Each structure stands twice: as structure tokens, then as C-alpha cells.
């Protein structure tokens, strides 16, 4: 798996129930756009605000709908046994990969983190993509990622949502250097091109929910060695990623941007998250106009 993977938003109705028609419409849009993977129950999908039953429902619904690209399911939790349960569920319904962020809230050392992932890897067969997001969860060091990758063949890759070129470089050199099939994806739109240049496999990036054409154009240009064009698209993504700085949360930023671009997904976040007001919406409108039009 390589290229542009979209961490899907979860559409909600005004009463906070899951908006299934909007989910169906968005998945159809992304598949027609030509993205290389769709990732449900992601951070962007507000998985921490969903019950286990809702996460299973979304995973099942996504499996019904995603039929032209790779299908990834997020199975992270602070409870190791819940991760195993969700991972087995994703495996049984035929997902291609699971994506597992580390436990959050309580600090854990590397021994505990290794045990957490090893318990999941030993009890399931589905390929696992580690998810390093140190701003929200316990960090995964290069050496821990390497140890997991070399000891468990079903630990297939890592998503790096970390604002550090050096860290991503070291993962690519240290881990891919010893296991060529280990995949490295950036989780940050603004790091897409440099991750590819360093030898990474692509990106799992939230702005691709509302502007996948930019990410896809960059990837195509890079693959075809049209590097001047790739630089232009990378500059667009660098500017577009400023959307996160304008809103109180990335969820608010993405859903407001989607509403401004005409998607039917409502600007509704589940509590405790809130959608920002008209002032922020206008700032996002201005940014989108400058970058995309």
C-alpha cells in the first residue's frame, strides 16, 4: 500500500447520531477521486467519542462501501483487551489493515508499550500499522518501532503524526533499512513530499477529506518525476495545513472546511468537542480561497 490514504471524518446529525447517508456519499466521493486507501475510526473520525458498538458499526459499514481501494480500521484504546477485540472484529470483516495508536492519558514506558502491541500482534493476523502521535498519546521511539517491526511480521508499518523530519528520516533508515516491506506514512499534510523524498510510502492526511485532488496531484507528480510540479503542490499543502491553526480542534477545522467546499457532512462534532463560530469559519474560507481557487 502506497500513496494517499484518507483518515475519514465521522458525519453526525444535529442530535449527534451517525449520519449514514453522508458517510456513504463521502466514501463514494473519495473512491471516485482515486485515493489509495480509506481509514475509518481515525482520530479525524472522533473515535474517542464513539462507543465500541458504534466503532464496530462504522467498521462494518465501511467494509460494505469501500470496494476500490485499501480499507483501514482504527482499533486504538487505552484498554489492551479492547484493542484486541476491535482488531479481531476488523480482521473478521475483511479489513486490509488496522491502525493502532498507543494508549493515551496514562504515561507508559517502552516495556509497557511493547507488551501492549505484542499482545495484539500475537493474538491477531491482520497487518497492523502503528500510529505515532506524541501530541495525543504515548510516543513511539525509533528503537521501539524497529523492535516491533523486526519481531512481528504482521506489524506492517507506521503512521508518523510528528512534526519532525529527523524522526521520520530515522524510522525510514533504521526500520526500512532492515525490513524493506515496512511502510512509513506521514500523518501531516505539510510533510507529505519530504516523506516521499526520504523514501517513505505516502501519507494518511486529514485535509484529503476536502482537497484530495491536491494530495493526489502531488503523489502523481512525484511518481512521474515531475518534481517542479510536486514542489508546487507541496507548497499548497503547506499553506492548506494552516487550517489546523485557525480552529480550536482539527475536527472543527476539517468539518468547517468541508462545509465550505460544499460537502453534505454537517459541521457537527460530538461533545466535548465544539465547532468554531463564524469568525473562524470566515478565516478558513479565506485560506481555502487563497490556496484552492
UniProtKB/Swiss-Prot annotation:
Entry EC number(s): 4.-.-.-
Species annotation: Thermococcus onnurineus (strain NA1)
GO molecular function, one term: 4-hydroxy-tetrahydrodipicolinate synthase activity
GO terms classed as biological process: small molecule metabolic process
UniProt gene name: dapAL
Residues forming the catalytic site: 43, 105, 131, 159
EC top class, as a word: lyase
Protein name: Uncharacterized DapA-like lyase TON_0506
GO cellular component: cytoplasm
